[in-house]
Amino acid sequence: MYEPARQKMIVSLGQEKIPPAHSSVCLLDKWVNTHHTTKKERYQLNVADVFSSYLSKLPNVIIALLVLLIGWAIAKIIEKAVYKGLSKTKIDDKLFAGKKPSRYSSEKVISKVVYFIALIIVFILFFNILHLTTVASPFVSMLSAIAAAIPSVLKAGLILLLGWAAASVLSFLVKKIGMKLNTSDKLRKWNLVSEGKDIHQAVNTASQIVFYLVLLVFLPGVLSSLKISGISGPFTNMMESVLAFLPKLFAAALIVLIGWLVARLVRDIITNFLASIGTERFAARMGLSIYLKDTSLSAVIGTIAYVLIMIPVVISALDQLDVAGISKPAVSMLNTILNMLPNIMIAIVLVLAGIWAGKWVKSMVSGLLHRAGFDSVLGKMGMEAGTPAKLSLSQVVGMIAQIIVILLFTAEALQIVRLHFLVEIATGIIAYLPNVLVAVFILGLGLYAGELVRKVLASMIKGQEFKSLAPIAKYTIIALAFFMALDQLGVAATIVNSAFIIVLSGFALAFGLSFGLGGKDFASRYLSTFERKMQNTEIEKNRKNQNPPNDM
């Protein structure tokens, strides 16, 4: 029965050594006495120990709280001091001039960073005073990392400050030079700006571009100092490419600027020279003023010279850029245009010659037809106009002849510049013109013949009942001519032929029915007379057969 009690006793007493004799009894008695003592005094001992432990730690807690409070106050003081010091430098106003104030300025951000670093130091002291090393160790590691990064940050800050100073100086120089070197007059002369406000805006824009470009040049050094290799490496490569490309870009821009100035100068010289020698009078004599409404021939020639100069200039600038993806297709296209320029010039000369020849043909054809009395043809066709027309018939024919001549020259010009699709269209139109002319001739002849037949029938046929025969004959001839003209034009030949046959058959049927129904009495009398004549002829023949003549 003592075995379970003995095991508990051994565990609770830490297996204290007991003499072998009477071991079981001694162990049991000692365990019982110890057990009864703990039950009575344990609570009092625990309360006293806890209270004394708290009392021993209370000074550390008070000191830690004082350190936390004082450290927080010092951190706030440092934050305000840093903010005021940075505000006096006006960094944001210099870096972001002309922009709306941001919600978080650089002064506020930097002062907050300093404030939180000071708070980290205060928390480290607070937790160390309380002997909470486990809680303080992350803050210590964080502060150690910040302290280790301070040299890099200072180095990056110095590089950024140097870059900002260099950018500010260069931007200031650009602005001053732009305002003092009579740039405004040159920009107005080149028609790049119109007002003084635009000039100031252009100069300010140029100075800001210089400012940010210089900052970008210093930015890879800042990133390298901060050891941000994930960003600094690609950004450094990009900046190296940009810096290597800038001389090419500057050279290309310089080439374009010089070429543009030369092209403008040549254009103005050619335009003024051609205007002084009377090119506009020549254009008016050639009839080109109609096509040059808002400009002049000298201005057009000057613009052509301007374009011819700018094309090789642009080719040279693109070659200088050495950007294969852009320069090669563009250079190839411009070279193709340059190779086509002789053909284009010949084509332009042909078109101008066609316009001049068309004008000459128009005047000649109109004059010949007018002297031949062609303007009275419409009157002979019965198509007199109630009010006099702006253009006479001879002028209309002359204009058609002019269009045909211009079209012929234009087709040849398109053939020279190898615009085959347009050549096919122009050739098709020219090939179709004879059909149109023949159709117009047939229709005009039909109108003339119809009017002539109407007049002849009206003069020959008297009587009210035959009054409608003359118009019917006229419009029958006109309809016949109209169908012949459509057939000549090839407009739905099957339908036109079928319609003509149907109309002609209708006329024949109508004539037959009208003759059969309206001329029934006349036909019966005519047939009776014809029958009597036949009978009389037979009787005379029989008499001759019965009384033959006597032969001698």
UniProtKB/Swiss-Prot annotation:
It holds the Pfam family MS_channel_1st_1. Keywords: Sporulation. GO terms for biological process: sporulation resulting in formation of a cellular spore. Coiled coil: none annotated. It comes from the Bacteria. One of its GO terms (molecular function) is mechanosensitive monoatomic ion channel activity. PANTHER family: SMALL-CONDUCTANCE MECHANOSENSITIVE CHANNEL. NCBIfam families: msc (NF033912). This is Uncharacterized protein YgxB. The lineage of its organism: Bacteria, Bacillati, Bacillota, Bacilli, Bacillales. The gene is ygxB.
